[in-house]
Structures are given as structure tokens and as C-alpha cells.
Amino acid sequence: MGYLLEETLSSNSKTPIVIDDDNELGLMAVRLANAAAFPMVLKAALELGVFDTLYAEASRSDSFLSPSEIASKLPTTPRNPEAPVLLDRMLRLLASYSVVKCGKVSEGKGERVYRAEPICRFFLKDNIQDIGSLASQVIVNFDSVFLNTWAQLKDVVLEGGDAFGRAHGGMKLFDYMGTDERFSKLFNQTGFTIAVVKKALEVYQGFKGVNVLVDVGGGVGNTLGVVASKYPNIKGINFDLTCALAQAPSYPGVEHVAGDMFVDVPTGDAMILKRILHDWTDEDCVKILKNCWKSLPESGKVVVIELVTPDEAENGDINANIAFDMDMLMFTQCSGGKERSRAEFEALAAASGFTHCKFVCQAYHCWIIEFCK
């Protein structure tokens, strides 16, 4: 049963609002129906450099900026005279999600003012080597290459097949990247896993005593760069396809080696598989893991860095939200890819010849899992 609440919506009026369960559900439904607005505004704000601009100002003086001031400080100065008005509309949406803070309208400026919230540091473009950045991840997720794939979801459910292949002439994601240099470069810039590795190294001790560490599918090599900076005695071998290594910078103690993990893997005392297994089917994962097993000594191990899905879909659980969001990304963008549960990782380890699977610690949304020979 509903009741009336007089809520002041402006300085001049009071409007009765009906509050009941149905009204609350209706509000939630409307929010879901319009959910596309937030990520697209987030993407545009990142591309414009809004977060970097606000965060730089907050670091210097902890002060608020008006949309006009923000526009004047962007990396690319807007030619549109209405840019401050449009930025204000974007920023107030971001403020409603606690991404930025909205201050009172300044009488002198005649505009709302905004300041970066702490969460902004995870979206700074220039922060990849420090804590990692989710900026590129957002931009990749809403690039036309991925958006076109999402449009295939209904047909894949009804008819089967591969969503990415349907959208891109039958090609799989990693084959496609070999044909699109722009997207490949953008994809390889996604850097938040560096934050995961740094966070894990605060507590994970599993690299002590390792002499040769192979990062299988290591991309541009930044993971080994981080590990080698803490353990300078380690010789790192960053192993990936030639096209992935083309953009790899040099890191002290790290050698880049080209090859195919489905054929063989360089030998080492230990190996890293960071966000690799979720790209592939169970059968493909077993092939990769068996090649790792062959190249390890008797006491060797594979350090798997992956998200672990909960067994139940709990309402309001942020880890479940992230896990199932990522699982749908794998479903649409990687042919046969998926996020896995503890039981599924244990099954992969056993099928590949490893004696046991140990879940060591969690860093942000990922787990550090050891597959021991």
C-alpha cells in the first residue's frame, strides 16, 4: 500500500510522490532501461580527458572546476561553444554514480562545479605503469568492434554459432586483431591487470626461489616487468605471438620470445597464465596447460591469474556482478571463452596432469591460483 510523501523539488514548490513497492520497482526498471547512457558517457569523458583534468587539479589544490574551466584545460580544446553546457550534463550523470563530486553552483561562475572522486585514479590514462588503468578497457569494450558483436547475441542464442565471427566475417578475436592495427593497439593497452599483479605481490610469495619465469601469452610483457622489478634475480621470458610482441617495450631481465602456446612453450621453473584461460574453451585450455606441464620441472607450477565465478548469483554482490559481466564479455567476444568456478579450475588442472590446484589469494577481482605439477 502506498503513501504520499511531500518532497521539495525546487525552492518554490512541493510535489506529492507516491512511495510503495511498485513505485520502487518501476524506478529500478526505468534505470535498467536507460542503463546504456552511463557507460557511453564514461567512455566519452575518458576520451576527452575529463578525469585526468579533474584529477590533476585535485592533486594540486583539491579545488572544484566549472565545466567552462574543464573545457579550457582538456587536451583538445573544444571548438563547440556549447561544450561547457554539454560537459555539465555529462558530469552531473557521473556525479550521480559517485564518480565525480558535484559542488554547489558558484555565484561568481554561474555554473555547477566538479571535483574528482578517489575512484577516478583507476581511470587515468597516464596511470597504467603506476596502478594500472581501466580507461582503455572502457574504450575497448565500447569500441564499434565489440559493439557490433553484442548485436549478434540474440541470434547466437537462437541459432548457435559465434557472436564475434558473425559480426566480423567469420574471424575469431585474435585473428581479427592481426588485421586491425588500430584495434590491436588499443586492446593491448588495457592495463588494469598490472594493478592486479602489483596488489597480489603485496602478499603472494610464490615467485621466491624462481630462476626462470615464463609468461605464457604475456602480451607486451608488462606483467614480467612488474615481477622482475621485485625479484631482480628472475630471468623473465615473455612468450606470445609475433603480432603481440611487435608493440612490446624492453624491460630489465625480460626476454621477448615469439611462438604459439598451442604448439609448445619455453621451459622455465614456473609459468604465468594471466587472464589467458578465460579466452578459450576447456579443450583449448587443456592443450595450453599440457604444453606448460611438459616444459616445467618436477616441482614446477603454473601461476594462474583469473576471475573465479561464485556458485550462486547473489543479489547485490559486487564480485558476482563483475564475474557475470566478464563472463558475458567472454561469451560474446571470445569464441568459447568463459569465466570459471573453483570446481572448473580444479577440473582443468586434473585434466592437464597437475597434481593439485591451490587458490592462494585474491587481488581486486582476480584470484592467484597455483597449478602444481
UniProtKB/Swiss-Prot annotation:
Output the GO biological process annotations, alphabetical, semicolon-separated: methylation
Which residues are listed for S-adenosyl-L-homocysteine binding in this entry? 217, 240, 260-261, 274
What PROSITE patterns does UniProt report for this protein, alphabetically? SAM_OMT_II
Recorded superkingdom: Eukaryota
Per UniProt, what is one GO molecular function of this protein?
O-methyltransferase activity
The residue range of the signal peptide is none
EC number(s) on file: 2.1.1.-
What Pfam families does this protein map onto?
Answer: Dimerisation (PF08100), Methyltransf_2 (PF00891)
Say yes or no: keyword Metal-binding present.
Answer: no
Pathway assignment reads: Secondary metabolite biosynthesis
Q: Look up keyword S-adenosyl-L-methionine and say if it applies.
A: yes
Q: Which InterPro entries match?
A: COMT-like (IPR016461), O_MeTrfase_dom (IPR001077), Plant_O-MeTrfase_dimerisation (IPR012967), SAM-dependent_MTases_sf (IPR029063), WH-like_DNA-bd_sf (IPR036388), WH_DNA-bd_sf (IPR036390)
What does the record note about the induction of this protein?
By the green peach aphid Myzus persicae.
User: What keywords appear on the UniProt entry?
Assistant: Methyltransferase, S-adenosyl-L-methionine, Transferase
The annotated active site, in chain numbering, is 278 (proton acceptor)
Q: Its quaternary structure?
A: Interacts with B'GAMMA.
Instruction: Explain the purpose of this protein.
Output: Involved in indole glucosinolate biosynthesis. Catalyzes methoxylation reactions of the glucosinolate indole ring. Converts the hydroxy intermediates 4-hydroxy-indol-3-yl-methylglucosinolate (4OH-I3M) and 1-hydroxy-indol-3-yl-methylglucosinolate (1OH-I3M) to 4-methoxy-indol-3-yl-methylglucosinolate (4MO-I3M) and 1-methoxy-indol-3-yl-methylglucosinolate(1MO-I3M), respectively.
Name the protein family.
Belongs to the class I-like SAM-binding methyltransferase superfamily. Cation-independent O-methyltransferase family.
Protein name as it appears in the record? Indole glucosinolate O-methyltransferase 4
